[in-house]
Protein backbone atom coordinates (compact mmCIF):
# COMPACT_ATOMS: atom_id res chain seq x y z
CA UNK A 1 0.00 0.00 0.00
CA UNK A 2 1.42 3.35 -1.02
CA UNK A 3 -0.80 5.59 1.06
CA UNK A 4 1.66 6.25 3.88
CA UNK A 5 2.28 9.98 3.75
CA UNK A 6 5.46 11.97 3.28
CA UNK A 7 4.83 12.44 -0.42
CA UNK A 8 7.36 15.25 -0.91
CA UNK A 9 9.98 13.93 1.42
CA UNK A 10 9.31 16.05 4.51
CA UNK A 11 9.26 13.09 6.88
CA UNK A 12 5.67 13.65 8.00
CA UNK A 13 4.51 10.10 7.40
CA UNK A 14 3.80 9.52 11.09
CA UNK A 15 1.43 12.50 11.14
CA UNK A 16 -0.29 11.68 7.87
CA UNK A 17 -0.54 7.99 8.66
CA UNK A 18 -1.33 5.10 6.36
CA UNK A 19 -4.75 4.80 4.78
CA UNK A 20 -7.61 5.29 7.23
CA UNK A 21 -11.25 6.30 7.08
CA UNK A 22 -12.77 9.08 9.17
CA UNK A 23 -16.38 10.16 9.48
CA UNK A 24 -16.33 13.62 11.09
CA UNK A 25 -15.33 17.09 9.98
CA UNK A 26 -13.37 17.49 13.22
CA UNK A 27 -11.17 14.49 12.36
CA UNK A 28 -10.38 15.86 8.90
CA UNK A 29 -9.51 19.28 10.28
CA UNK A 30 -7.36 17.84 13.05
CA UNK A 31 -5.33 15.75 10.61
CA UNK A 32 -4.88 18.61 8.15
CA UNK A 33 -4.01 21.13 10.87
CA UNK A 34 -1.37 18.81 12.34
CA UNK A 35 0.38 18.33 9.00
CA UNK A 36 0.31 22.05 8.19
CA UNK A 37 1.60 22.92 11.68
CA UNK A 38 4.58 20.66 11.03
CA UNK A 39 5.30 22.45 7.76
CA UNK A 40 3.70 19.87 5.50
CA UNK A 41 1.49 20.18 2.45
CA UNK A 42 -2.13 19.01 2.37
CA UNK A 43 -3.74 17.72 -0.82
CA UNK A 44 -7.44 17.21 -1.51
CA UNK A 45 -9.16 15.45 -4.40
CA UNK A 46 -12.94 15.69 -4.64
CA UNK A 47 -14.81 12.80 -6.22
CA UNK A 48 -18.18 11.10 -5.86
CA UNK A 49 -16.72 7.61 -6.25
CA UNK A 50 -16.77 4.91 -8.95
CA UNK A 51 -13.01 5.33 -9.23
CA UNK A 52 -11.24 4.61 -12.51
CA UNK A 53 -7.75 5.10 -13.89
CA UNK A 54 -8.36 8.79 -14.49
CA UNK A 55 -9.08 9.32 -10.80
CA UNK A 56 -6.19 7.11 -9.73
CA UNK A 57 -3.74 9.04 -11.90
CA UNK A 58 -4.75 12.26 -10.14
CA UNK A 59 -4.47 10.58 -6.72
CA UNK A 60 -0.97 9.28 -7.46
CA UNK A 61 0.18 12.77 -8.39
CA UNK A 62 -1.40 14.22 -5.25
CA UNK A 63 0.28 11.60 -3.08
CA UNK A 64 3.66 12.31 -4.70
CA UNK A 65 3.35 16.06 -4.15
CA UNK A 66 1.68 16.27 -0.73
CA UNK A 67 2.32 15.03 2.81
CA UNK A 68 -1.34 14.36 3.54
CA UNK A 69 -3.75 13.29 0.79
CA UNK A 70 -7.47 13.52 1.53
CA UNK A 71 -10.38 12.22 -0.55
CA UNK A 72 -14.11 12.21 0.28
CA UNK A 73 -16.51 9.38 -0.46
CA UNK A 74 -19.92 10.91 0.01
CA UNK A 75 -22.95 10.85 -2.22
CA UNK A 76 -26.48 11.01 -0.89
CA UNK A 77 -29.70 12.83 -1.79
CA UNK A 78 -29.33 16.23 -0.16
CA UNK A 79 -32.15 18.75 -0.78
CA UNK A 80 -30.69 21.93 -2.19
CA UNK A 81 -27.33 20.35 -3.04
CA UNK A 82 -27.51 17.16 -5.09
CA UNK A 83 -28.74 16.99 -8.64
CA UNK A 84 -30.35 14.49 -10.97
CA UNK A 85 -27.41 15.22 -13.28
CA UNK A 86 -25.21 12.88 -11.22
CA UNK A 87 -25.31 9.60 -13.19
CA UNK A 88 -26.51 6.43 -11.50
CA UNK A 89 -23.44 4.29 -12.19
CA UNK A 90 -22.58 1.68 -9.60
CA UNK A 91 -20.58 2.78 -6.59
CA UNK A 92 -18.84 0.47 -4.15
CA UNK A 93 -17.37 2.83 -1.58
CA UNK A 94 -15.41 0.09 0.22
CA UNK A 95 -13.75 -0.91 -3.05
CA UNK A 96 -13.19 2.75 -3.91
CA UNK A 97 -11.52 3.34 -0.55
CA UNK A 98 -9.20 0.36 -1.10
CA UNK A 99 -8.22 1.68 -4.54
CA UNK A 100 -7.67 5.17 -3.13
CA UNK A 101 -5.48 3.92 -0.29
CA UNK A 102 -3.42 1.83 -2.68
CA UNK A 103 -2.89 4.87 -4.93
CA UNK A 104 -1.68 6.99 -2.01
CA UNK A 105 -4.63 8.53 -0.16
CA UNK A 106 -3.99 8.84 3.57
CA UNK A 107 -7.46 9.91 4.66
CA UNK A 108 -10.84 8.93 3.21
CA UNK A 109 -13.68 11.09 4.52
CA UNK A 110 -17.00 9.19 4.69
CA UNK A 111 -19.45 11.38 6.59
CA UNK A 112 -23.12 10.78 7.24
CA UNK A 113 -25.57 13.25 5.71
CA UNK A 114 -26.19 14.77 9.16
CA UNK A 115 -22.46 15.43 9.56
CA UNK A 116 -22.14 17.23 6.25
CA UNK A 117 -25.51 18.97 6.25
CA UNK A 118 -26.99 19.24 9.76
CA UNK A 119 -29.69 21.69 8.63
CA UNK A 120 -31.78 20.66 5.63
CA UNK A 121 -32.70 21.75 3.09
CA UNK A 122 -29.50 23.62 2.32
CA UNK A 123 -30.30 27.31 1.83
CA UNK A 124 -26.88 28.59 0.71
CA UNK A 125 -25.25 27.77 -2.62
CA UNK A 126 -22.41 28.89 -4.85
CA UNK A 127 -23.99 30.07 -8.09
CA UNK A 128 -21.54 30.43 -11.02
CA UNK A 129 -21.94 33.54 -13.14
CA UNK A 130 -24.13 33.10 -16.22
CA UNK A 131 -21.25 33.66 -18.62
CA UNK A 132 -19.45 30.66 -17.10
CA UNK A 133 -22.42 28.34 -16.63
CA UNK A 134 -25.31 29.15 -18.96
CA UNK A 135 -23.86 28.00 -22.32
CA UNK A 136 -23.13 24.49 -21.02
CA UNK A 137 -26.07 23.64 -18.82
CA UNK A 138 -28.24 22.38 -21.67
CA UNK A 139 -26.32 19.11 -21.68
CA UNK A 140 -27.65 18.19 -18.25
CA UNK A 141 -29.57 19.40 -15.23
CA UNK A 142 -29.00 23.17 -14.92
CA UNK A 143 -28.20 22.76 -11.22
CA UNK A 144 -25.15 20.56 -11.80
CA UNK A 145 -22.48 23.28 -11.83
CA UNK A 146 -24.04 24.94 -8.81
CA UNK A 147 -24.08 21.60 -7.01
CA UNK A 148 -20.43 20.87 -7.80
CA UNK A 149 -19.23 24.35 -6.83
CA UNK A 150 -21.21 24.35 -3.57
CA UNK A 151 -20.00 20.90 -2.51
CA UNK A 152 -16.36 21.64 -3.30
CA UNK A 153 -16.47 25.03 -1.58
CA UNK A 154 -17.69 23.22 1.52
CA UNK A 155 -14.92 20.62 1.28
CA UNK A 156 -12.26 23.29 0.81
CA UNK A 157 -13.57 25.05 3.91
CA UNK A 158 -13.42 21.81 5.88
CA UNK A 159 -9.89 20.88 4.79
CA UNK A 160 -8.43 24.38 5.00
CA UNK A 161 -5.43 25.62 2.99
CA UNK A 162 -4.57 22.90 0.50
CA UNK A 163 -3.67 21.91 -3.02
CA UNK A 164 -7.01 20.99 -4.60
CA UNK A 165 -6.54 18.44 -7.36
CA UNK A 166 -8.91 17.96 -10.26
CA UNK A 167 -8.84 16.79 -13.87
CA UNK A 168 -8.88 18.71 -17.13
CA UNK A 169 -11.50 16.36 -18.59
CA UNK A 170 -14.29 18.44 -17.08
CA UNK A 171 -12.99 21.78 -18.31
CA UNK A 172 -16.11 23.83 -17.55
CA UNK A 173 -16.32 22.80 -13.87
CA UNK A 174 -12.55 23.30 -13.63
CA UNK A 175 -12.92 26.86 -14.92
CA UNK A 176 -15.74 27.51 -12.46
CA UNK A 177 -13.58 26.25 -9.57
CA UNK A 178 -10.62 28.38 -10.59
CA UNK A 179 -12.79 31.48 -10.62
CA UNK A 180 -14.57 30.50 -7.39
CA UNK A 181 -11.41 30.25 -5.28
CA UNK A 182 -10.33 33.68 -6.53
CA UNK A 183 -13.69 35.41 -6.13
CA UNK A 184 -14.36 33.94 -2.66
CA UNK A 185 -10.73 34.11 -1.42
CA UNK A 186 -10.72 30.37 -0.73
CA UNK A 187 -7.31 29.15 0.39
CA UNK A 188 -7.04 26.35 -2.13
CA UNK A 189 -4.60 26.09 -5.01
CA UNK A 190 -6.35 24.40 -7.93
CA UNK A 191 -4.07 21.79 -9.51
CA UNK A 192 -5.38 20.58 -12.88
CA UNK A 193 -4.19 17.19 -14.14
CA UNK A 194 -4.15 16.20 -17.84
CA UNK A 195 -6.92 14.13 -19.39
CA UNK A 196 -6.38 10.38 -19.05
CA UNK A 197 -7.31 8.54 -22.24
CA UNK A 198 -7.87 4.92 -23.08
CA UNK A 199 -6.05 3.34 -26.00
CA UNK A 200 -8.77 4.35 -28.49
CA UNK A 201 -8.73 7.98 -27.34
CA UNK A 202 -11.87 7.93 -25.20
CA UNK A 203 -11.54 9.80 -21.90
CA UNK A 204 -11.40 7.59 -18.83
CA UNK A 205 -14.77 8.24 -17.20
CA UNK A 206 -17.20 6.55 -14.84
CA UNK A 207 -19.89 7.30 -17.41
CA UNK A 208 -18.33 4.83 -19.85
CA UNK A 209 -19.70 1.95 -17.78
CA UNK A 210 -23.24 3.03 -18.74
CA UNK A 211 -22.65 2.82 -22.50
CA UNK A 212 -24.10 0.10 -24.67
CA UNK A 213 -21.65 -1.84 -26.83
CA UNK A 214 -22.65 0.23 -29.85
CA UNK A 215 -22.29 3.53 -28.02
CA UNK A 216 -18.95 2.47 -26.53
CA UNK A 217 -17.70 1.72 -30.03
CA UNK A 218 -18.89 5.13 -31.26
CA UNK A 219 -17.74 7.22 -28.29
CA UNK A 220 -14.10 7.68 -29.43
CA UNK A 221 -15.55 9.82 -32.23
CA UNK A 222 -15.49 12.72 -29.75
CA UNK A 223 -11.71 12.71 -29.58
CA UNK A 224 -11.39 11.90 -33.28
CA UNK A 225 -13.45 15.01 -34.06
CA UNK A 226 -11.29 17.11 -31.75
CA UNK A 227 -8.08 15.88 -33.35
CA UNK A 228 -9.52 16.57 -36.80
CA UNK A 229 -10.33 20.11 -35.68
CA UNK A 230 -6.81 20.57 -34.33
CA UNK A 231 -5.39 19.33 -37.63
CA UNK A 232 -7.51 21.88 -39.49
CA UNK A 233 -6.17 24.68 -37.30
CA UNK A 234 -2.61 23.46 -37.75
CA UNK A 235 -3.23 23.53 -41.50
CA UNK A 236 -4.17 27.21 -41.27
CA UNK A 237 -7.91 27.37 -40.54
CA UNK A 238 -8.68 30.42 -38.37
CA UNK A 239 -12.46 30.64 -38.79
CA UNK A 240 -13.97 29.50 -35.49
CA UNK A 241 -17.35 28.79 -37.09
CA UNK A 242 -15.68 26.45 -39.56
CA UNK A 243 -14.13 24.55 -36.65
CA UNK A 244 -17.46 24.39 -34.81
CA UNK A 245 -19.14 23.06 -37.95
CA UNK A 246 -16.42 20.44 -38.39
CA UNK A 247 -16.88 19.24 -34.82
CA UNK A 248 -20.67 19.07 -35.11
CA UNK A 249 -20.55 17.29 -38.44
CA UNK A 250 -18.16 14.59 -37.20
CA UNK A 251 -19.93 13.99 -33.89
CA UNK A 252 -23.53 14.15 -35.17
CA UNK A 253 -22.78 11.15 -37.36
CA UNK A 254 -22.80 8.98 -34.22
CA UNK A 255 -24.75 10.90 -31.53
CA UNK A 256 -26.83 14.04 -30.95
CA UNK A 257 -24.53 16.96 -30.17
CA UNK A 258 -25.05 18.86 -26.91
CA UNK A 259 -22.46 21.46 -27.87
CA UNK A 260 -19.31 21.87 -29.95
CA UNK A 261 -17.47 25.05 -29.08
CA UNK A 262 -14.23 26.96 -29.42
CA UNK A 263 -13.65 29.21 -26.41
CA UNK A 264 -11.06 31.21 -24.57
CA UNK A 265 -9.41 28.71 -22.22
CA UNK A 266 -9.68 31.02 -19.21
CA UNK A 267 -13.00 32.84 -19.61
CA UNK A 268 -14.98 30.31 -21.70
CA UNK A 269 -15.98 33.18 -24.00
CA UNK A 270 -16.65 32.20 -27.63
CA UNK A 271 -13.89 33.31 -29.97
CA UNK A 272 -13.65 34.18 -33.66
CA UNK A 273 -11.16 34.30 -35.27
CA UNK A 274 -8.96 31.78 -33.52
CA UNK A 275 -6.19 33.37 -31.46
CA UNK A 276 -4.57 32.86 -28.07
CA UNK A 277 -5.02 30.09 -25.52
CA UNK A 278 -8.12 28.18 -26.60
CA UNK A 279 -10.15 25.15 -25.63
CA UNK A 280 -12.21 23.01 -27.97
CA UNK A 281 -15.16 21.67 -25.97
CA UNK A 282 -17.60 18.97 -27.06
CA UNK A 283 -20.45 17.02 -25.49
CA UNK A 284 -22.81 14.46 -27.00
CA UNK A 285 -25.73 12.35 -25.85
CA UNK A 286 -25.06 8.62 -26.20
CA UNK A 287 -28.53 7.18 -25.53
CA UNK A 288 -28.97 9.19 -22.36
CA UNK A 289 -25.35 9.24 -21.24
CA UNK A 290 -23.72 12.61 -21.84
CA UNK A 291 -20.01 12.32 -22.61
CA UNK A 292 -17.65 15.29 -22.59
CA UNK A 293 -14.22 15.89 -24.06
CA UNK A 294 -11.88 18.77 -24.76
CA UNK A 295 -8.43 19.65 -25.99
CA UNK A 296 -6.26 22.70 -25.54
CA UNK A 297 -4.88 24.69 -28.43
CA UNK A 298 -2.54 27.65 -28.63
CA UNK A 299 -2.84 29.86 -31.69
CA UNK A 300 -0.05 32.38 -31.49
CA UNK A 301 -1.60 34.85 -33.91
CA UNK A 302 -4.81 35.25 -35.86
CA UNK A 303 -2.94 35.55 -39.16
CA UNK A 304 -3.21 32.73 -41.68
CA UNK A 305 0.44 31.72 -41.28
CA UNK A 306 0.33 31.64 -37.46
CA UNK A 307 1.57 28.64 -35.56
CA UNK A 308 -0.90 26.36 -33.75
CA UNK A 309 0.17 23.96 -31.03
CA UNK A 310 -1.78 21.14 -29.35
CA UNK A 311 -1.42 21.16 -25.59
CA UNK A 312 -2.69 17.69 -24.66
CA UNK A 313 -1.00 14.24 -24.82
CA UNK A 314 -1.45 11.93 -27.77
CA UNK A 315 -3.94 9.06 -27.71
CA UNK A 316 -2.95 6.23 -25.39
CA UNK A 317 0.14 7.91 -23.92
CA UNK A 318 -1.43 8.87 -20.60
CA UNK A 319 -3.25 5.67 -19.69
CA UNK A 320 -4.54 2.56 -21.38
CA UNK A 321 -6.71 0.49 -19.06
CA UNK A 322 -7.97 -3.10 -19.23
CA UNK A 323 -11.48 -3.23 -20.65
CA UNK A 324 -12.52 -6.02 -18.27
CA UNK A 325 -12.50 -3.90 -15.11
CA UNK A 326 -14.95 -1.00 -14.87
CA UNK A 327 -12.64 0.76 -12.39
CA UNK A 328 -9.87 1.01 -14.92
CA UNK A 329 -11.80 1.02 -18.17
CA UNK A 330 -14.12 3.92 -17.58
UniProtKB/Swiss-Prot annotation:
Q: What is its main location?
A: cytoplasm
UniProt KW Cytoplasm keyword: yes
Gene Ontology terms for molecular function: ATP binding; pantoate-beta-alanine ligase activity
Supply the alphabetized keyword list: ATP-binding, Cytoplasm, Ligase, Nucleotide-binding, Pantothenate biosynthesis
Q: What is its EC number?
A: 6.3.2.1
One GO term describing the cellular component: cytosol
Which GO terms are recorded in the biological process aspect for this UniProt protein?
pantothenate biosynthetic process
Instruction: Tell me the pathway.
Output: Cofactor biosynthesis; (R)-pantothenate biosynthesis; (R)-pantothenate from (R)-pantoate and beta-alanine: step 1/1
Database matches in SUPFAM superfamilies: Nucleotidylyl transferase
Q: Give the first-level EC class, as a single word.
A: ligase
Q: Provide the assembly information.
A: Homodimer.
Q: What else is known?
A: The reaction proceeds by a bi uni uni bi ping pong mechanism.
Per its record, how is this protein called by name?
Answer: Pantothenate synthetase 2
Q: Which gene encodes it?
A: panC2
Amino acid sequence: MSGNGGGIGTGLGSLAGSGRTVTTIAEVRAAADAVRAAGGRVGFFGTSGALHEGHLTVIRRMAAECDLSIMPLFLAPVPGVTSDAVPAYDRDFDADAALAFDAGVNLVFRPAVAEMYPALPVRTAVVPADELAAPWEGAEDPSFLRMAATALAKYYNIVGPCRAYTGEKDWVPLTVLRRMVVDLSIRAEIVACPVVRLADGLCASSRNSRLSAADRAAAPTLYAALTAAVAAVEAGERDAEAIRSLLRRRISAVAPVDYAEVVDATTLARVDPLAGELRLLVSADFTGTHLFDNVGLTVRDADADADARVTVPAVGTTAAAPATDRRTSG
